[in-house]
């Protein structure tokens, strides 16, 4: 089990084109089956990684305007809307939209692609994206 998150931002606010950058990221250590991380849910680990990614990038939780988290193995009771749980546990305001993506092995990558598309379309300026299993 591990979790990784990234902060994506639009770096051309005043132009018609939007260049997008991953400004920072964080991940948890890789865990073994029934290892030391067994008592933590993916959502708890996701929140730890999300908080660290925001801290490293200097982004406040209130600045996040979309949270997109990929999760293929929704095995715990709180994983049905995992992105919302991660966002709230990381301090992102309740009014911020959250989207959980399931694209099996590519869920985390799809969350980054979706966040970039939202920024490109002007639906977001700063997004929190990542994957958790």
For the regions a language model picked out, list residue spans one by one.
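Conserved catalytic cysteine-centered active-site region
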Residues: 71-127
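Short, positively charged and aromatic/hydrophobic N-terminal segments
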Residues: 1-12
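Conserved beta-strand-centric core segments of catalytic alpha/beta enzyme folds
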Residues: 11-49, 107, 111-133
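Short, well-ordered amphipathic alpha-helical segments that serve as non-catalytic structural scaffolds
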Residues: 43-58, 82-86, 111
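Metallo-beta-lactamase
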Residues: 67
